[in-house]
From Swiss-Prot:
It comes from Feline panleukopenia virus. Its EC number is 3.1.21.-, 3.6.4.12. This is Initiator protein NS1. One of its GO terms (cellular component) is host cell nucleus. InterPro entries: Helicase_SF3_DNA-vir, P-loop_NTPase, Parvovirus_NS1_C, Parvovirus_NS1_helicase. Phosphorylated. Its cofactor is Mg(2+). GO terms for molecular function: ATP binding; ATP hydrolysis activity; DNA binding; endonuclease activity; helicase activity; metal ion binding. The gene is NS1.
Amino acid sequence: IQTKKEVSIKCTLRDLVSKRVTSPEDWMMLQPDSYIEMMAQPGGENLLKNTLEICTLTLARTKTAFELILEKANNTKLTNFDLANSRTCQIFRMHGWNWIKVCHAIACVLNRQGGKRNTVLFHGPASTGKSIIAQAIAQAVGNVGCYNAANVNFPFNDCTNKNLIWIEEAGNFGQQVNQFKAICSGQTIRIDQKGKGSKQIEPTPVIMTTNENITIVRIGCEERPEHTQPIRDRMLNIKLVCKLPGDFGLVDKEEWPLICAWLVKHGYESTMANYTHHWGKVPEWDENWAEPKIQEGVNSPGCKDLETQAASNPQSQDHVLTPLTPDVVDLALEPWSTPDTPIAETANQQSNQLGVTHKDVQASPTWSEIEADLRAIFTSEQLEEDFRDDLD
């Protein structure tokens, strides 16, 4: 037999999960009545905390970051959404990249389909758009844990039961390099939490921004090159070097949901099998994002031909020559309807109308003479013989 209190908590929990509530602030804004009701009960703070923890755990275990982003897409805006002119893709276009390929790779990582390459790394100089892209993705996911470098002993204290881990301005990993490598590769590990016991982190996508070369690990004064390649194997490397103008602005919160919906709509599923089908191979550390080139007009509104040069190579096209039919031959050899008028006479008539006289005008062949020459060269037998040679 369930008590009234149990029924109330279960109903509240279902509402919180359905509305994707992941923080006390979201709860206060979206469900203020249930928040006040629980807060007024004895032990209300612990009740709020435990209820919210169940909600975030449910989302982390049943949904991926990509799915949470996709849910927020506005289908009415998707019809006229221009992917190439979105702020995120404008940044990629500044570098001459295939912006569909980059977005597709990011979507695969967010959907936990990147395998060992479980981290999206935006790195490069300041003011190149690293943080605004990462912030837009994190806001679209909602259930995000942040790495706290200031908390030396418990830097991952906020990263349990999350759909995405955001590491802003990452620096030298130092003595935490092994923990970083485990989390960045999507392994299940246990971490220590302040005032609590250890807690398990399930495979969670990571998004990271930095101005430094994080592949160089220094512990004290000693450089540890053995960690360089393992770190590269865990990162989707996106190096941004083009500085943005001062009035570029932030990425709209609705942009990434529309990007994900656009990819799904046009057949770019967020799986590594689909990625290799479109782009030939899995992404690597030194991936060339500029290849293959995107055809002009690939994302113009209403454009249905979304094929890139990767899928339009000559080997994939089977061209079959059509035999030359008799009616085509007759049409080619049919007498022309143009009057039998010399070209020179026509030019003189036009010149006289304009008040201009031409001297020493060389006589040009008439249309009949040109037709006779062409008929002598391209006879019916010759056309059929040439076409038969092409077929052979």
